Amino acid sequence: MAVADIKTAEIVKDNARSANDTGSPEVQVSLLTARINELTPHFKANAKDHHSRRGLLKMVSRRRRLLDYLKGKDLDRYRALIEKLGLRK
């Protein structure tokens, strides 16, 4: 397995609601957060990389929409996820 696959499997295992869960909002938000955190140093070093920045902004928007959905669906799960990932300080 590649390093990214191992990290992905670990993130899914840590945030899954059941054994085969890969699509719950918690898992999706956690995976997006990991990808966003990996890209952030790239933009500190490459400020003019606007093409990749657009992809980053799309990921941030998708994460925000998933969090909004989860907040409306189950507020307790939303708060637990925000606390776990350290978002919205």
From Swiss-Prot:
GO CC term, one of those recorded: cytosolic small ribosomal subunit
Keyword Endoplasmic reticulum: no
BP GO annotations: translation
Keywords of this entry: Ribonucleoprotein, Ribosomal protein, RNA-binding, rRNA-binding
PROSITE patterns in alphabetical order: RIBOSOMAL_S15
Molecular functions per Gene Ontology: rRNA binding; structural constituent of ribosome
InterPro entries: Ribosomal_uS15 (IPR000589), Ribosomal_uS15_bac-type (IPR005290), uS15_NS1_RNA-bd_sf (IPR009068)
Signal peptide: none
Function per UniProt: One of the primary rRNA binding proteins, it binds directly to 16S rRNA where it helps nucleate assembly of the platform of the 30S subunit by binding and bridging several RNA helices of the 16S rRNA.
Subunit structure: Part of the 30S ribosomal subunit. Forms a bridge to the 50S subunit in the 70S ribosome, contacting the 23S rRNA.
Family note: Belongs to the universal ribosomal protein uS15 family.
NCBIfam families: S15_bact (TIGR00952)
Protein name: Small ribosomal subunit protein uS15
Gene label: rpsO
